A protein has these predicted regions:
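Extended, composition-driven regions rather than compact fold-specific motifs
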Residues: 1-267
Length: 267
């Protein structure tokens, strides 16, 4: 069986919206709801679980600086390295309501970087810039089974996967989070097995170590030529996973592997 993603291009547009709601899903994951008239015509596809946007975080409401969209539909990124634009990061679209013009984004709460610290201090009325989506990826929905390896950063996309796949889809997922308090409720069908892995157990684990161990010990029966495997976590862990999976290419079609580096540790 041949399985593949289908990519759909979306016209690029720069928008802004304001925070209208903040909700903590867990001690480490916060949902922020944005709303604004510029979200009219937003390029959200309900069957694209990995669809994402670039969020721009202005230092003040009057200091939102985003690239210009050129006549050919591309973005003018000149000067990005010199700080021409507001700080920006990629984030998964968790939900979009085209009637209410609201956009939900889930943030991992941490002290490093841009998005996490912003989310910790976010308040109603704050403004964000929204760039994209540029294109969306529709995954196959006809695999015999699905295997997932995710962490907090890819948990919003995985939650969308569970909503997109057919209710009868057979799914095995390993989800690495800090501890049991970081679990969140996930909608899913009857044939879904969720394996929560806790870094804080046993004296603490390096990010991604539990996910890689789960992959190493993955039962052979979990893989077939009709399996679709999606992993999204730290870049170095993804590289190790790729090497491991390439050694199993007699069990799973390499074209059915979708491994994405969602973030990278700074050494």
């Amino acid at each position: 069986m041949m399985l593949k993603n289908t990519r759909i291009e979306v016209p690029l547009k720069a928008r802004s919206a304001r925070v209208i709601r903040i909700m903590d899903l867990s001690p480490t994951l916060r949902r922020v709801r944005l709303q604004g008239p510029e979200l009219e015509g937003f390029g959200f596809h309900p069957l694209a679980p990995e669809a994402h946007v670039k969020l721009f975080f202005p230092h003040t409401p009057d200091d939102l600086r985003m690239p210009e969209v050129l006549e050919d539909g591309s973005a003018d990124w000149q000067g990005a390295a010199e700080g021409r634009f507001s700080p920006f990061r990629d984030y998964t679209i968790r939900a979009f309501d085209e009637q209410q013009l609201t956009l939900d984004i889930d943030f991992v709460l941490h002290d490093e970087g841009v998005g996490g610290p912003w989310a910790k201090q976010a308040k109603i009325g704050d403004i964000l810039g929204i760039f994209g989506p540029r294109s969306v990826k529709l995954p196959p929905t006809n695999a015999s089974n699905y295997v997932f390896f995710v962490d907090e950063t890819s948990l919003p996309a995985f939650a969308r996967w569970l909503e997109v796949l057919p209710n009868e889809a057979r799914i095995d997922a390993w989800i690495e989070v800090a501890n049991a308090d970081s679990e969140i409720p996930l909608y899913h069908g009857d044939n879904v097995k969720l394996n929560w892995l806790y870094r804080d157990s046993g004296g603490g684990q390096l990010y991604g170590a539990l996910l890689y161990h789960a992959l190493e010990t993955l039962p052979i029966l979990s893989l077939s030529d009709a399996t679709w495997l999606w992993a999204a976590t730290e870049a170095h862990v993804i590289a190790k996973m790729k090497r491991r999976l390439m050694s199993l290419n007699s069990l799973i079609n390499p074209a059915h592997l979708d491994l994405v580096a969602y973030w990278k540790t700074v050494s």
